[in-house]
Every structure is written in C-alpha cells, then in structure tokens.
C-alpha cells in the first residue's frame, strides 16, 4: 500500500487542475491564463505552475517577465502578478537569464525540476492551482502526474482545436489520462471560428465541432468553444487582463462559462 505524502507546500491548496493538450499551438497556455483570470474575478485565489519547460509563455502573458523568485523559509516564493496577490505564478521562465534562452536539458533534469516545483514552491492558501503542462505526452507528464498524485488533483482540462489532426492528438491525451488514472474534468475547443466584429457572423476558419464530437464519443464533458478573438490576442501580447478589459468581446462569454463550470465542480472556495 502506497504511503500518504506529506502535504508540505501544497497543504493550503484546495483544488489542483492540470491543463493538457495533445499538440502544441492549440492555445493551452492561453486557456490556463484566462481561466486563472476568470477564477480571480470570481473571488478565488489562484496559482499557476508553468511546467512547460521548453516554452514558458505565461510570464509574458501576465506581464511578469523579468521578475525574480526568491527563497523563503518554506521554499521558493512565487511571483504575484496583481496588487491584490490573488494570482501567483511559478515558471522556469523566471530562472532563465534571458527570456528567449533555450532550455536544453535531458529528461532526468527536467523531471527533477518538475518534482522540485511541486514540492518546493510556497503557495500558501489557494483555491485553485492550475498546472500548465507541455504539449503531448512524455516523461515530463508522467513526472507531473506522479508528483501530484498524492495530493489528489481534481483532474485534467484538455484543450484542442477543431482540426482533425488536433482532435486525433487529443484522443491520445485522453487515453493517457485513463491509463494514469487522471480524471478528465472536460474538453475545451479553442480557435473555433471567427466572429466578425461588425456583423457578429461566425466563420469557421477551421473545421467545425471536432472537439464537441470527440467529447461525446469519449464520454467526457464538453466545457465550451472559444472563438478566435483579436482582442484576446492583443490582451495576451500586452499583458492585459482580458476578463476585466474586454467584457464585450466574442471570447469573453465562452471563457467565463468554462470558469463557471470548473467552479461548479468544486465546493465553495476560500473566504
């Protein structure tokens, strides 16, 4: 029988959600960032653990590039990205000398850092910890799941786009979740059509409905479709709070709905 893990620095974290994608370029880190912002505006304290070691993009999305982490009494202190200290972030991007520096590490070194991130970051009290993972399935994913398993993560949020090739990759991601015993909270389809800002007509730039159909066939919840949205892209490039600044944009209701569905999965958060 496996021994229970010491809660350590995750003792104050109520719910852990992994964000996965079958391939790169589907907007996984975008969904992680916007979900964190939406949860924050719902009154929750949120942490983001960016373990996409070779592509740590979240510091830029949250305008936190160049910030430094430091060692506290209980471990690494994450970077707070807002004045209220309601969103904290830990990323390998904070450990690089230059933002565009390549991480050229072999598997064992990556896995060791992932385990250190899980055990040694002093998160304090959080309602949600979102874990932004690399694309695909690899040793790094196994390291993340193994390190978090003793802490009973809520499950995985899987991100795809409508194209058949992306949907095929997500099938493998869902198989991975089943094999490692990781519950799938739901599937999100990103980049699902472009809504004209003038007439509000939606044009399906890629194929249509692949994510929803896959969710139905796989027997997992479909949490929603997020359209292509220039204002969302602009907010990420500028490090702005999309949920606060663009409530009338096409992507806003979709992202808010996904956050509400995550909230409905869990009991009331911290006061």
Swiss-Prot record:
Organism: Bos taurus
Role according to the record: Component of the cytosolic iron-sulfur (Fe/S) protein assembly (CIA) machinery. Required for maturation of extramitochondrial Fe-S proteins. The NUBP1-NUBP2 heterotetramer forms a Fe-S scaffold complex, mediating the de novo assembly of an Fe-S cluster and its transfer to target apoproteins. Negatively regulates cilium formation and structure.
Upper classification of the organism: Eukaryota, Metazoa, Chordata, Craniata, Vertebrata
This protein's UniProt keywords: 4Fe-4S, Acetylation, ATP-binding, Cell projection, Cilium, Cilium biogenesis/degradation, Cytoplasm, Cytoskeleton, Iron, Iron-sulfur, Metal-binding, Nucleotide-binding, Nucleus
Iron-sulfur listed as a keyword: yes
Cofactor mode of binding and number, as noted: Binds 4 [4Fe-4S] clusters per heterotetramer. Contains two stable clusters in the N-termini of NUBP1 and two labile, bridging clusters between subunits of the NUBP1-NUBP2 heterotetramer.
Subunit structure: Heterotetramer of 2 NUBP1 and 2 NUBP2 chains. Interacts with KIFC1. Interacts with NUBP1.
Gene: NUBP2
InterPro entries: Mrp-like_CS, Mrp/NBP35_ATP-bd, NUBP2/Cfd1_eukaryotes, P-loop_NTPase, YlxH/NBP35
Gene3D superfamilies in alphabetical order: P-loop containing nucleotide triphosphate hydrolases
Disulphides: none
Entry's Gene Ontology cellular component terms: centriole; centrosome; cilium; cytosol; nucleus
An MF annotation (GO) of this entry: ATP-dependent FeS chaperone activity
Any one of the GO BP annotations: iron-sulfur cluster assembly
Modified residues (N-acetylmethionine): 1
PROSITE patterns hit by this protein: MRP (PS01215)
Entry-linked Pfam families: ParA (PF10609)
Cofactor(s) needed by this chain: [4Fe-4S] cluster
Record flagged with keyword Repressor: no
Record's subcellular location: Nucleus; Cytoplasm, Cytoskeleton, Microtubule organizing center, Centrosome; Cytoplasm; Cytoplasm, Cytoskeleton, Cilium axoneme
Name under which the protein is recorded: Cytosolic Fe-S cluster assembly factor NUBP2
Record-stated family: Belongs to the Mrp/NBP35 ATP-binding proteins family. NUBP2/CFD1 subfamily.
Positions that bind ATP: 22-29
Binding-site list for [4Fe-4S] cluster: 196, 199
